Structures are given as structure tokens and as C-alpha cells.
Amino acid sequence: MASEVRVRFAPSPTGHLHIGGARSALFNYLFAKNQGGMFVLRIEDTDQARNVGQAKEKLLDSLKWLGVEWDESIDVGGEYGPYSSMERLDIYKKHIEQLLNEGKAYYCYMTEEELEAEREAQIARGEMPKYSGRDRDLTEEQRRAYEAKGIKPVVRFRVPEGQVIKIQDAVRGEVSFESDGIGDFVIARKDGVPMYNFAVVVDDHLMKISHVIRGEEHLSNTPRQVMLYEAFGWDVPTFAHASLILNPNRQKMSKRDESIIQFVEQYKELGYMPEAIVNFLALLGWSPVGEEEIFSLEELAAQFSLERVSKAPAVFDTDKLAWMNNQYIKNADLDDVVALALPHLQKAGKLPESLSEEQAEWAKAVISLYQEQLHYGAEIVELTELFFKTEIQYNDEAQEVLNEEQVPGVLSGFLQELEGLDTWDAVSIKGAIKATQKATGQKGKKLFMPIRVATTGQTHGPELPSAIKLIGKEIVTHRLRSLLN
């Protein structure tokens, strides 16, 4: 076993980075940082049918955006490369031949139709379907007969019979599997390309991976991988299987579940902050010491340990993520919040792609009003709607305020004060509200609510004089006149 801690994240380039994959990458990264080890990023691209163009680049971009940096990979190299499975085919071929020569693997000529018929018969008998072992002990003559018919074989691993495979899992403790429940499994396809379970074992061994940290869904692969390690006479790494991630309804998360946003790139596009996503994912199945919930990447790395990774399922609480992102937005520099929110106003057609200096200052001021309450960048479009239209619709709650008997007097008094202003700024508007209070004798809610509702259309909102200033004199006075008429 390698004395140095070496961990890896090995995604398949089949699409965007899923939040489950992002959590696995993060746990590996944090463990490596905590232990002074190395974090390897490897691309498992042997399943050519499922690979998606540009997915490799998107995976790397999403990890970089999160701040999860690797020590060795396809882009930075390293002494244990290549770091892409399809560039390692000669290495796998050599190891498959070794198992064939030692009688630990064999060629299987069963067709898909034969395997399906076998499977259906087993299910009909109430048995767990597994490969029967028909081609386990073929003679050379039988093999030649199949090949004469043009049947291309797969390579299967010969699973030892009557064994108990014990795994000391760093999260779950001892986990046992019966080898008799596992049929001889395929380690190489008909074209010679290895299956995932084989390639991952060869790669992890040759890259000196000390700890395999991944999600619970991989636990069922582990006995197959352990048997391969033992067949080669290699040390088995330490396995650590983190808990399943459940959706907010406490059901197992499915990539087809559209009720929840599941890909890192989507959160980026919505205007979430990478620091918040990292913080949230770290707490999804790992618990720090104490009650604190807000951590930087460095603070997480300083605390992270496998002992505090939970085996109980973790619920992906979207409200908690929105709350956490808001904590980061509240504490961010205003320029960073503008960079997060402004593109969404431009994309929605509220502001032009190219802003004048005056427009940029105005947009910054509007966004600043919502920094305290903004949950993610795209939310700014809905929050700031009142700044981008002349006429506003008053909902029932707003209409109730406007129906109060003191309202006409308050609004006409306020309109008069605004029209008399020489300068249009928050201080002057605050003065106009005070003057209206003096002239009408109204104060508190009786004064402020009608003014807020009439000028913004909302019963709650940002600091009022600043909002009125940014809406603009022409639109504000028009709204007041429309109501009074």
C-alpha cells in the first residue's frame, strides 16, 4: 500500500458534472488537502457509446469553477499518465492477457439473445439472475468452433466459488459479500475495450491510489474490484462510500428528476456562487465539529476527515442551498454581486448588452438595493421588475392599502412635494416624505405604506427613498397621478 495519500475522481464524459459527482470530487480533494496528499483527475472514457462531445472540457470547467484543483490529469500531466482510459488500452490488454494465461479469466461466446433467454429462465424460476458459467471450461476445439462461426467473445473473470469478500469501509465499517451471488462478470468487451470495473482497478493500482472515496451507489461494484485486486496479488486500497443523496422528498435522486436542478453548470448559469455550492456540498453527508455552517474551501480542508462522513442518506435541501448562497451574496463585494446579477438583466432584455457609464452606475445602484435578499443572480429579474415598467399592477394586498381613507391626501401631498424638488436624490426624497408627514398629520404605516405601494407596487421592498430615486421622477410622478385620477 502506498504510504502517501493519493486519491482520485474518475468521471465518465457522458454529460455535465452532476452534483453527486461534484460532491465525490470535493470529498477527495478535501481529504487530499487535509492529508497533504495528491488529488488525481482521471477520465473514464471506455464506454464510447455513452461519451458526449465536449463533456470532458465541461467537466474540467465545472470543477475549476468550484475551485477544486487537481495535481495530475489530462491537462497538467503527471508521472502516472496517461490519465484518459482510451489512451491506456495497451496497458489493459496486457493485464487481461495475464488473467487469461493464469486461468483467472476466459473467453465467453454467448450471444445477447442467449444471455437474455438464460436471464428470463432464471427469473421465471425465482432465482437472482447471474451468468450461468456455460463457457467457463470450454475446450480449445469448442472455442475454435465458435470462432469459425464468426462469433466474437467477451472476456469474463472467473469468480472464485464459496468465498466471502470482506471490505473494511472507512465510512461503513465491515461490509461482506458472498462470491456465489456474483456471476462471472465481463472484464473486456468483444472489441477488447475493458469494462469499467476492470479498468478502474488497473488504473488505481498503477496510479498508486491509496483511498477510493465515492458514493454509496458504487458499493455493489466493490466486491468485483476487490476480487480483481486479489487475482493480481495487489494491495487493496481503503474504500470509503459516502451516503446516498436524496431529493427534497427523501427519495433516491434520479438524473431524470426535473423537480430539482442537478448539474453544477446549471447552478453557475442561475448565478449561484461557487463558494456556496462547495460549502453546501461539503455538508451533504459530512459534518464538521460544532454548530458553524459557513466554511471556506481552506477551512473545510482543515477540518475534513473520513470519520465524520455519514452513512445515513443526505437530503439535498434546495431551500438550504438558497439560504447559504444568500449568506455568501450578503457578504460579497458589491462588484461581485453585480457581476453575478447584471448578465441576467441583460439576458432578459431589461438592459442592453453594452452599457453606458451612466447605465452601469444605475444598474449597480439598483442591484445594491437587493444584495441583502438576493438568493441567486437570476432572481434579480423578478425582484427588480418595478424599475423597468411605467405602469404597475396592484395585487389584492396592495389594493387593500390603497383603499384606506387617508391615502388620497397622502399621495397628493407627496406628489406635490416631489414636483417641487430641485434635486432628485434619496436625501431630497426622504425630505419630501417628512414634509408630507407634516402636511397630512399621517405617520408610520399610514404614511409609508401608501407611498411604497403607489410608487413601487409592493407592500415590502428595498429602502424606499433610494428605490424612488432610481425609478426616476417621471415614472414615479406618473404612477402617483394615475392613482389619484
From Swiss-Prot:
Motif interval(s): 'HIGH' region: 11-21
Subcellular location, record wording: Cytoplasm
Motif 'KMSKS' region per UniProt: ranges: 252-256
InterPro entries given in the database record: aa-tRNA-synth_I_cd-bd, aa-tRNA-synth_I_codon-bd_sub2, aa-tRNA-synth_I_CS, aa_tRNA-synth_I_cd-bd_sf, Glu-tRNA-ligase_bac/mito, Glu/Gln-tRNA-synth, Glu/Gln-tRNA-synth_Ib_cat-dom, GluQ/Sye
UniProt name for this protein: Glutamate--tRNA ligase
Organism: Halalkalibacterium halodurans (strain ATCC BAA-125 / DSM 18197 / FERM 7344 / JCM 9153 / C-125)
Family note: Belongs to the class-I aminoacyl-tRNA synthetase family. Glutamate--tRNA ligase type 1 subfamily.
EC number: 6.1.1.17
Any GO BP annotation: glutamyl-tRNA aminoacylation
Keyword field: Aminoacyl-tRNA synthetase, ATP-binding, Cytoplasm, Ligase, Nucleotide-binding, Protein biosynthesis
